[in-house]
Amino acid sequence: MATSRLQLEGDDSVHLHITHANLKSFSADARFSPQMSVEAVKEKLWKKCGTSVNSMALELYDDSGSKVAVLSDDSRPLGFFSPFDGFRLHIIDLDPSSVTTGGWLEDTSLVEKYNISEEDYAKRTDSFRKFKEKRVSQNPVAAEAKTKENYMEDLCANIKVGDRCQVEPGEKRGMVKYVGRAESLGPGYWVGIQYDEPLGKHDGMVKGTRFFECPRLQGGMVRPDKVKVGDYPERDPFEEDEI
């Protein structure tokens, strides 16, 4: 066990798993400098989960699931609490009126929904259904063929495998690993991305088809209009706007 906790030579950062008491589906992995104050850690986490710094409590758990510390002093450096690679940093939102309370950000059944009867919707002239019916009636065959064959093909002209890129939303950075069609995902063109961090959904295989190779949870398939290629180097984990 002690061997797994050793840091890389010349690298004093620590790799922690992040969870949130109110957001059961929230999960992230990030590196922190032990020199960061607890307050600075909270500021980085606030940008990711929405819990304000003043309402955030942090608990540290070891890799066996045992609580080893409560980070109660915002002025102390993270290293004071002796975190090791693989430990878990657990966020607790102390604000009872927070948007994270009660699962509001995850449970869509809690949101009051707008309902309209089928009869009333059919009478509307400004609905998406009417717009789609009009487009199809004008040239149904050509419209369908264009969608299947050429959707966003023009946006792929300057996107090449190996390009560094930034993907929206979230300004996620990575490398282009695939450019082309992906019938299992939908008509038109897609871009396969290997993200620098585990922000993806797969390892390059989607619905039984392998489009490229990459580490688990670092792969993504997105539309070309979400991709900007250029000088987007891998971010320093200790940049101001990053965890």
Curated annotation (Swiss-Prot):
GO terms for cellular component: cytoplasm; cytosol; nucleus; phragmoplast. The keyword Chaperone applies. Involved in control of cell division. Regulates probably the availability of alpha-tubulin for dimerization of alpha-/beta-tubulin, which is required for proper microtubule biogenesis. Decreased expression of TFCB results in enlarged mesophyll cells and leaf epidermal cells with bulged nuclei, increased ploidy and increased numbers of spindles and phragmoplasts. GO terms for biological process: cell division; embryo development ending in seed dormancy; post-chaperonin tubulin folding pathway; tubulin complex assembly. The lineage of its organism: Eukaryota, Viridiplantae, Streptophyta, Embryophyta, Tracheophyta. Residues 181-223 form the CAP-Gly domain. PROSITE patterns: CAP_GLY_2. Disulfide bonds: none annotated. The keyword Cytoplasm applies. It holds the Pfam family CAP_GLY. This is Tubulin-folding cofactor B. Expressed in roots, stems, leaves, flowers and siliques. Disruption phenotype: Embryo lethality. Belongs to the TBCB family. SMART domains: CAP_GLY (SM01052). Supercomplex made of cofactors A to E. Cofactors A and D function by capturing and stabilizing tubulin in a quasi-native conformation. Cofactor E binds to the cofactor D-tubulin complex; interaction with cofactor C then causes the release of tubulin polypeptides that are committed to the native state. Interacts with TUBA6. CDD domains: Ubl_TBCB. It is found in: Cytoplasm. GO terms for molecular function: alpha-tubulin binding. Transmembrane segments: none annotated. Keywords: Chaperone, Cytoplasm.
